[in-house]
Amino acid sequence: MIDQKIFETTLNIDDPTNFCTNVEAHLLKELENIYVGKCFKNSFILNITGVIQRSPCFIMRTNNSGRGYMHVRFSAVVSYLNAFDLIAAVKIIKNDSNIILGESLLTEPVTIVIPSSESQNNVAEVGQIVPVQLANSSVYYIPGRQQASATGSIFIPKHTFSVYHVQEELTQEQALNLTKLVNIIEMLLESRSKKDFKQICFFEKLYYTYSISSDEILDLKIWKGPKGKEMSRLKPCNVLSFLYDALKNKSSSLGFWARPPNLLKSSPLAYQQDQNSFNATELPIICSAEVMFVTLLKEIINYLQFMNDLCDTFNNEQLIKRHENIWMLIEQRKIGHDF
């Protein structure tokens, strides 16, 4: 994720006399030299956007070095990864009996370790590009390093899903706060509309939870899965339209919400029920409407970005064909696959 953060630090100044001849210029240059292109406080700093606050240049009195120091608050554009993030393009750089190592081609520099216990060790070849999901609490940003490190695995379609029990209505103010995430989804959908339709179909079918025969077609315009996979008696709602109605107090968020496997993962759809009849493996999560919608919207964003990145990375038939072993691994983990 790209974001802007504010940091506080103390800079050591070797030549205070020269530094103070043009503090602003020297300070910005020093910050860029130390932090840009490196890890710092759980982020990878892309560029410094400004100095917010600084102290005077103090002279060290604990020795006779003549050096100085300055306390600084600065803002920076950063990139950072979270647990369970999806990365569409990780190039395998090492694969032996002990470990798989890959480097992300899309995010900040990060080395990803796929544990040797994973069955995909015998599938991915050095030089191939694989889609990866990061593990829980697995991203490490060691200060000063020029790349982060993480653990993960080749991303396989998920069979499980969560059910959320909402007992209080979403307020207009909360709905307004969610429009930033809605805008991101609309931007990603616009980007998706400009991509090759055959590629979108290929990857949507690849990551659909159920095994799909060649004569079954996904309707990507109305976000429905193949015939026979829809949930009976239930009609999904478009979360984006729902939130626009919530701004006008025209929708009720009470009840049970879920995005089960029959929906395309990058669709903006979800199911809402008065009584819970979802066939989930875990008990419903009781939470506020705002927390539930933030969770659903972020999931939609992650999958949409993931699908767009897959289309951009594997942008020709030859490249897709060279990775058939990876697609076969993914297909074998689907519900309904004949082993």
From Swiss-Prot:
Record note on domains: Contains an extended C-terminus, with no homology to characterized proteins.
Keyword Cell inner membrane (UniProt): no
GO BP term, example: viral transcription
Lineage, opening ranks: Viruses, Varidnaviria, Bamfordvirae, Nucleocytoviricota, Pokkesviricetes
Domain of life, source organism: Viruses
Disulfide bond residue pairs: none
UniProt similarity note: Belongs to the Asfivirus DNA-directed RNA polymerase RPB7 homolog family.
GO CC terms of this entry: DNA-directed RNA polymerase complex; host cell cytoplasm; virion component
Stated name of the protein: DNA-directed RNA polymerase RPB7 homolog
Compartments it resides in: Host cytoplasm; Virion
Oligomeric and partner information: Part of the viral DNA-directed RNA polymerase that consists of 8 polII-like subunits (RPB1, RPB2, RPB3, RPB5, RPB6, RPB7, RPB9, RPB10), a capping enzyme and a termination factor.
Induction context: Expressed in the early phase of the viral replicative cycle.
Function: Component of the DNA-directed RNA polymerase (RNAP) that catalyzes the transcription in the cytoplasm of viral DNA into RNA using the four ribonucleoside triphosphates as substrates.
